[in-house]
C-alpha cells in the first residue's frame, strides 16, 4: 500500500468519526485491525520498508489491544467470518496477481479490497441498514483509490 499523505490521514480520521457515529471503541477496533492488515500486506508484497516499531505495535495490538477492545469482543461472532473471508481473499489475490492472465490480475485487484467490508459491517452494526447504505459507497470510494492498471 502506498504511503498515505498527512491530508489523507486526517480525512480518514474524520471519515471514521462520521461513518462510525463517533463510537470510539469501534474506531479503535478498525484502526488496530487495519494497522496489522497493512503490516501483513507490506511484509508480503515488500513494497515499503517495514519498521520494527510497526511490527511491535501490530503484535501488541493483536495480542493485547484487540482482545481487550469492548466493541470487538461484543461483536466477535459477527466479525470472524468477515475476517476469515478477508484473509482468504488476501491469499487468493496474492496468487492471482502473479498470473499471466489479465482477467485474473483484474480479479486479484478487486478481491484484495474485501477488507473494506469490515468498515461497512461496522457502520451497519452501529447505525443499522439505512446508515450503512448512507456511507457504504463513500467508504468504498475512499479506500479504493487505485486503478487496476497501476496495481
Residue locations for each model-derived region?
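All-alpha prenyltransferase/terpene-synthase fold signal
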Residues: 1-151
Amino acid at each position: 500500500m502506498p504511503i498515505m499523505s498527512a491530508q489523507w490521514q486526517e480525512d480518514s480520521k474524520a471519515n471514521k468519526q462520521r461513518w462510525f457515529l463517533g463510537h470510539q471503541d469501534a474506531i479503535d477496533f478498525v484502526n488496530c485491525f487495519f494497522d496489522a492488515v497493512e503490516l501483513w500486506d507490506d511484509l508480503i508484497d515488500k513494497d515499503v520498508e517495514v519498521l520494527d516499531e510497526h511490527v511491535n505495535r501490530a503484535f501488541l495490538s493483536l495480542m493485547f489491544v484487540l482482545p481487550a477492545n469492548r466493541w470487538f469482543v461484543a461483536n466477535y461472532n459477527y466479525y470472524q467470518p468477515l475476517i476469515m473471508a478477508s484473509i482468504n481473499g488476501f491469499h487468493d489475490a496474492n496468487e492471482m496477481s502473479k498470473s499471466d492472465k489479465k482477467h485474473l490480475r483484474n480479479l486479484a485487484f478487486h478481491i484484495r479490497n474485501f477488507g473494506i467490508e469490515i468498515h461497512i459491517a461496522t457502520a451497519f452494526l452501529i447505525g443499522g441498514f439505512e446508515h450503512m447504505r448512507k456511507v457504504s459507497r463513500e467508504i468504498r470510494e475512499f479506500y479504493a483509490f487505485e486503478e487496476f492498471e497501476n496495481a
